Amino acid sequence: MNSENPNTLKQSKDHRYLKLLYLCLLVLFSRAESIWAQEQMLSNSEYTFSIARSPMIEALQQFTATTGIQVLFEDGVSGKRETVVLDGTYTAEQALGLLLADAGLSAEPVASQTVRVTLTPRPGDDPFRVASEIEEIIVFGTKQGLGLQRVTDSVELFTAERFEQEVVFDLGEAVTRAVNASVIRNDLNTINIRGLDRFGTDSAGVSQAINIFIDGAPASSNALEGGGQSLWDIGQLEVLRGSQSTVQGRNSIAGSVVVQSKRPDYDWSGAARLRAGEYGSRQYSAAVTGPIVDEQLAFRLSTDYQETDGFVDLGFDGSSSDFRDLWVTRGKLLLEPEALDALSAMLSFEYTDRSVGAAEGAVNAPTPISDPSFSDFDPNDLESFPNLIRSVDYNTTRITSDVAYDLSSEINLRFVGTYEDAEYDGVNGSSLTSSFGQLGSFFFGFTETLTAEFRVEFEYEKWSGIVGAYWFESQQDATVEAVSLITDFAPFPVTPIDSIFSLAVPRETDVENAAFYTQWRYEPNQHWSIDLGLRYDDESYDLRTVAEVPRTAPDECLTNIPGVFVGSEDPFVSLPCSTVAPLFSNPDTPLQSDEFGVWLPRAAVSYHLNDDLTFFVSARRGYRAGGPFIARSDELEVLVDTFDPEFLISYEAGWRGIWLEGRLVLNGTAFYSEYEDQQVRVQDARGFERIDNAGETSLYGLELSSDYKVSETLSIYANLGYLETSVDDFIFTEESDPPLNLAGNELGRSPSTSITFGLNYAAGNGYFAGASANYRSSFYADILNLDEDDLGSGFSERLGSSIMLNARAGYRFDRFTITAYVTNLLDEDEPENVSLAGLADSGAVEVATRPFFNMRQPRAFGASIDFVF
């Protein structure tokens, strides 16, 4: 253990963060100073012009001849536009303004003695239509380069602009704004899409149901745990609802989240942010991008430091419970060499350092609900009484490479390789003076992941699509070491009195996945398109769990450390003599293994009524891999077995529409799914809790999304999610008579209605304001569906409806933006999640010894200053 003072270590880490932040700011402001100098030159130098009314291209050539300032513009910008007569003495900026004003064009400096002319909507133009024609948003998750209005998947899309509008700074918080999706305590390991949790119905299984991709790399659970995923310098976030198994493969039976950070640019630009809010919330961020070799090599560098004291205090001493510190730095290089103009390569590097306490908003009650004193406990007091005080450090390194080569105008080759190393080291320290003498536990481990994907992307006449091969390899090591004082629970006198009992449980998991997949789109004419996809996915698991526990062997004594007890509760053993032996299996025995191969088809047919309206139907098969498990009975018997994959068969229909001459986008998707061979935990008659394919569930629903440009200054959006889930078969325990079946229950965290709504106002004079609301109807916390009748009290695990309202207002200068914001304006206090009780092996209700609640952060005010150049 490190003997340094934790405060000293934190200060040392803070200094590292600030040094990198200062470096980014230094580059940023040096480039800003250069650009300001260019702008000052354009503003102060005067020239005499004599330009007659003429075509735009000729007028700009005369402007260059007079000033020496080069003018850049894209093809089609000049068109048939003509300029006004310009005769007199003006600065370069004034002259350009007069030449371009009536042509719907504007200019901005991009380098020394260089400006770029770009298209801007004229007063009579529809700004929404112009924007959609110039730059249609591409959905990266489909891997086919399709625009949002051309995909048949149900996608909730967030841009950097929407992050600002909704006042969100964390990735998990943003995902919660998607309908039919939720995240607890901003921890993406808790993500739920259409009623399916990331770790399965009741956390059974060894794989996940929802994958998170960050710049093309699948994020491991260790990299996501505890929350704290920065949105700074993120360009786009996609929440894809419904199975993505055919194209994305493993861990995407329920959907996926695709995150893309901003790309390097050949023009110098940058940004910085200073933010402060209640509950000790602070953010210091910077980003800069520019050319290394003009039009051939560009870079982007960003850094973000965020911290919060949290909003839950420990009931024992009032100290912060759910604190969080986050530092992330990201670098990108874009290579597009002139000597090989068909090649484009992107290399990305990201390092994240997080320190977190208890789960955000976690409140533990001091007593069970059966205790009369529980009625005096109010979770909204935001005081927690946990058995153990938690603190964890997470460190994640992520490297990705994306290399594309155009063989021809029809065929493109692409290779995507990723590497991730996610490490963690934490401690649960005891908050109790006497409860089995528990001191706490230490836990540490890592997950190392490698992926490689090669695909051929083609577009030839009426055909387009991809053919790809994928390889994945992951190694995970995790160890939990529990440490307790033996004095209070040993059935015999112990000397010395501080003797320690230790239990270590290491777990090793190795995963390999290989796949071949293809996705084709055929468009026989302008009205019809047919999508066909197929994937063969092969996955293997190796698993070993070894529990090292004390065993007595006085004649083979291996340890003799005064004052330390690692050994038996046998009163005939002379302390501190002991040995350590494995409980579950010998460390030298082979790992428990299993392997599965599945075919995953999908198909869709779309009818394009016109350029603005498309109808579609689709069907697909998703899966989550099976694997091995090791279980222990109450009598310490060991069971080693395997379970099969689970499947989600989905049928969807919907439309994608642009209405009111481009001012309204209205999309809809209806779905019906059959969740088959669910992996669930079953308590069998022998006392083993095994994993079995013993569940079946039906679910259906609807997702609507709309975005309406009311005027030049006002826009609104509204999204609706509807969801119904019904468990058809779920054997919970075989020990009861008859076996307890949860048929008829709802899946946990499946509100029937979810709504998001927002409006944004931006006046031409710099003032702006906006508000967003997020509504969820009531739902059960888990599949047990325990209510007041089950608990025999006024308590229930069905959470009530809730609405979160955020608002912001500010003023935008040329380079600076000042924003004031408030989150949870209505001070909503309905918990995000709750755990009060469970079911025993017999099926009887068991009240939790320490009920816990995941509370929402109360109303909080904050302000930020953003700088761009």
Question: Which functions belong to the PLM regions below?
Answer:
Residues 60-62, 66-67, 119-164:
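Short, acidic, small-residue-rich periplasmic hinge/interaction motif at the N-terminus
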Residues 137, 398-406, 412-428, 608, ...:
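Membrane-embedded beta-barrel scaffold of Gram-negative outer-membrane proteins
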Residues 207-209, 221-223, 232-241, 246-315, ...:
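Outer-membrane beta-barrel translocator/receptor signature
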Residues 258, 266-267, 275, 287-386, ...:
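Periplasmic-side early beta-strands and strand-to-turn transitions of outer-membrane beta-barrels
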Residues 334-338, 342, 456-458, 462-464, ...:
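Structural signature of Gram-negative outer-membrane beta-barrels, strongest in the C-terminal barrel
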Residues 464, 526, 530, 665-667, ...:
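Gram-negative outer-membrane beta-barrel transporters
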Residues 623, 775-784, 810-869:
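C-terminal beta-signal and adjacent terminal beta-strands/loops
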